[in-house]
Amino acid sequence: MRLLVLGSAAAEAVPGVFCRCRVCDTARREGGREIRSRTAYMLGDDIRVDFGHDAFWHTVRYGLDHTRLRHLLFTHSHGDHMDTPDLWYRKPGFCQVPDDAVLHIWGNEHVLRRGG
């Protein structure tokens, strides 16, 4: 199974929108690998760990097909790991997914309470 690191930054990402520290200035100047989106991972094509503010960007950047996603694991309920409004767009009327495409959501009680 392939592990793909989609992002590895904290909630503010790198470069931070309002930050002028050395790390963020270097990221702005050099770009490329210095630019870091918020933490998330893919395990194969059907398991995703965390679905934060950068989920759309990750999908475009890495050419992900989330109609194949079957398991979504939230490590915790902070917004940079759990951006639930984007999940609403998986419902009928917003997109078309195969009828048998069940998405299982995994997380602790705080995740399940927030997502409900």
What are these regions (language model features)?
Residues 78-82, 113-114:
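Active-site environment of divalent metal-dependent phosphoester hydrolases
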Residues 6, 41-43, 105:
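Generic structural hydrophobic/aromatic packing signal, biased to beta-strands
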Residues 12, 91, 112-114:
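Flexible, glycine-rich phosphate/dinucleotide-binding loops
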Residues 97-116:
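Metallo-beta-lactamase
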Residues 1-4:
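Extreme N-terminal starter segment of soluble prokaryotic enzymes
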Residues 15-73, 77, 84-95:
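Pre-active-site segment of Zn-dependent metallo-hydrolases
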